[in-house]
């Protein structure tokens, strides 16, 4: 492939319409490149005119032949955005960038630990890249790129707010997140129980910011909302039994011991803490998870 031809791939270009064969237009690039256009990829109701130039996005098909579309993708070789993961396999993550074909993020660019690979529905912050053989891939944004693009926050406006964001970089020391509003958030390893997936939609509580306007966050609940061992055990059993158990502070010590393996006093203290923090309700001789309680499962 000639260098000039490579320069138009993955970008938006003005191409001249030089012919029509069946349902396929023939286009010519600025340096004489031959590009094809299927009629289904025209967004103008009027037919294209032979000899006229129009704006198109140029991309290679799986065989490397150049095609064009007027349906502009979410990303280009000069533009980054979040794109949805369609599937993952041994080759890497296949993503939807708004083109007639899916695009691959090679496995070499994903985390070494497959447990934190993205799954279908996750979204990754990427750009397009074209290799020497005219193959098109998606590339994860680097820390340098995010540093140039994030929206800084220099006050305490976001303090204790819960923000939805997605991890774009995962390290042993912590998780680096980016929100759809451009906030850059770092969650130290001590502020998480487990590492999120790359691209997973997570809720993070803001606990501070630094001099560069980067936010610090936590996946852990506030200290007064954290559960002790007994509270966590009751919570886990509630989740296991679809959020409801026929027990209350009126239940017998024997029944409590049999199911929860704790004394009645410990049980009453634990459900009292859960109730105070609106994690459960206690009524009609039973305990049940609240909406807030169900929400803790994601944490």
Swiss-Prot record:
Q: List the disulfide bonds.
A: none
Pfam families on file:
CvfB_1st, CvfB_2nd, CvfB_WH, S1_2
Annotated protein name in UniProt? Conserved virulence factor B
Tell me where on the tree of life, at the top rank, the source sits: Bacteria
InterPro entries according to UniProt: CvfB_fam (IPR014464), CvfB_S1_2nd (IPR048588), CvfB_S1_3rd (IPR048587), CvfB_S1_st (IPR039566), CvfB_WH (IPR040764), NA-bd_OB-fold (IPR012340), WH-like_DNA-bd_sf (IPR036388)
Q: Which family does it belong to?
A: Belongs to the CvfB family.
GN (gene name): cvfB
């Amino acid at each position: 492939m000639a260098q000039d031809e490579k320069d138009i791939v993955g970008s938006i270009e003005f191409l001249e319409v030089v012919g029509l064969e069946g349902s396929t237009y023939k286009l010519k690039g600025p340096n004489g490149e031959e590009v094809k256009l299927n009629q289904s990829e025209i967004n103008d109701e009027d037919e294209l005119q032979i000899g006229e130039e129009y704006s198109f996005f140029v991309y290679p098909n799986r065989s490397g032949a150049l095609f064009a579309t007027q349906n502009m993708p979410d990303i280009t070789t000069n533009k980054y955005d979040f794109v949805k993961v369609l599937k993952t396999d041994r080759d890497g993550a296949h993503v939807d960038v708004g083109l007639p074909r899916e695009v691959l993020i090679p496995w070499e660019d994903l985390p070494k630990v497959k447990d934190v690979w993205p799954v279908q529905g996750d979204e990754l912050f990427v750009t397009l890249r074209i290799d020497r053989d005219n193959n098109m891939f998606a590339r994860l944004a680097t820390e340098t790129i995010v540093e140039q693009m994030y929206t800084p926050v220099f006050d305490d406006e976001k303090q204790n707010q819960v923000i939805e964001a997605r991890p774009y970089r995962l390290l042993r020391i912590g998780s680096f997140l980016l929100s759809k509003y451009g906030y850059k958030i770092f969650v130290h390893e001590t502020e998480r129980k487990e590492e999120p997936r790359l691209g997973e939609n997570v809720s993070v509580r803001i606990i501070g910011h630094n001099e560069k306007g980067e936010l610090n966050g936590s996946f852990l609940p506030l200290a007064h909302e954290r559960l002790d061992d007994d509270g966590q055990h009751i919570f886990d059993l509630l989740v296991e039994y679809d959020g409801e158990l026929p027990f209350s502070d009126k239940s017998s010590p024997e029944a409590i011991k049999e199911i929860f393996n704790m004394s009645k006093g410990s049980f009453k203290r634990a459900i009292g803490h859960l109730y105070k923090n609106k994690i459960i309700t206690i009524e009609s001789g039973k305990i049940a998870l609240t909406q807030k309680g169900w929400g803790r499962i994601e944490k």
